[in-house]
Regions:
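Core SAM-dependent methyltransferase catalytic element
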Residues: 187-208
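Conserved proline-anchored active-site loop of SAM-dependent methyltransferases
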Residues: 64-68, 125-137, 149
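Class I SAM-dependent methyltransferase Rossmann-like catalytic core
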Residues: 30-39
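A short glycine-rich, Lys/Arg-flanked "PGG" loop and its adjoining helix->strand segment in the class I
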Residues: 143-155
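Conserved class I S-adenosyl-L-methionine
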Residues: 164-178
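N-terminal auxiliary segments of SAM/dcSAM-dependent transferases
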Residues: 1-21, 36
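Conserved SAM/SAH cofactor-binding pocket of Class I
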Residues: 43-121, 130
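Conserved beta-strand signature within the Rossmann-like core of class I S-adenosyl-L-methionine
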Residues: 156-163
Length: 208
């Protein structure tokens, strides 16, 4: 059930995007300056259609770089028993993700402003997800969006993420470099989806 009486709700509002996933309809209000404000990003859609975590009922989920909240909110609806946390460094994105969580009646969602995972509640998480930003530089991607999330996973937990094809020069090298259980789930024109499974005991350090 969605609350449809909140638009327009602030001066940055651009439009409402509808999205159907796993037979359910969602609505996302977006601002002009938020990522993918025209339609649901193809990478986000690909990730959501592929993600099948090993834990059938994850209890804690984290969406890193959530934007307007699409991935985390969809997963919150799919896993209503889970405590779902969304983080983003952009405070306007945080505002819209909070609004969209209310709009889609996902009461199990918490949205926080955070550079990387600096303000995220401590783990462990069963499932972490991200549509990794492409233009922050290889070093930031490797440390803030690959290694750091793994430190917050429970043993055997999973990190599912999507990247634009321009990052395929980097991501496959990180598996052997850091001894990660990294698997490319699907590649198609424009995007690739990967999964990393946290080891049963020790997390990778990935020291700076």
């Amino acid at each position: 059930m969605m609350n449809s009486n909140l638009v327009p709700f602030d001066p940055y509002y651009k439009k409402r995007i509808t999205y159907v996933w796993r037979g359910q309809q969602f609505a996302f209000d977006v601002a002009h300056t938020i990522f993918s404000s025209f339609q649901i990003d193809e990478g986000t859609d690909l990730l959501l259609r592929l993600i099948e975590p090993a834990f059938s009922e994850p209890q804690r989920i984290l969406d890193v770089g959530c934007g307007c909240g699409v991935i985390g909110i969809c997963l919150a609806r799919r896993f209503p028993q889970a405590d779902v946390t969304l983080v983003d460094k952009d405070l306007l994105a945080v505002r819209y993700a909070r609004h969209n969580a209310e709009l889609n009646a996902t009461t199990n969602v918490t949205v926080l402003g955070s550079v990387g995972l600096s303000e995220a509640p401590p783990g462990p998480y069963d499932l972490i997800v991200s549509n990794i930003p492409a233009k922050i530089g290889d070093y930031a991607i490797e440390h803030e969006f690959i290694l750091e999330p793994l430190r917050h996973l429970r043993p055997g937990g999973e990190y599912w993420f999507v990247v634009v094809s321009g990052l395929n020069h980097l991501i496959p090298r990180l598996g052997p470099r850091h001894n990660l259980r990294l698997k490319e789930i699907k590649k198609r024109a424009g995007h690739s989806v990967y999964r990393i499974i946290a080891p049963a005991a020790t997390m990778p350090t990935g020291g700076l």
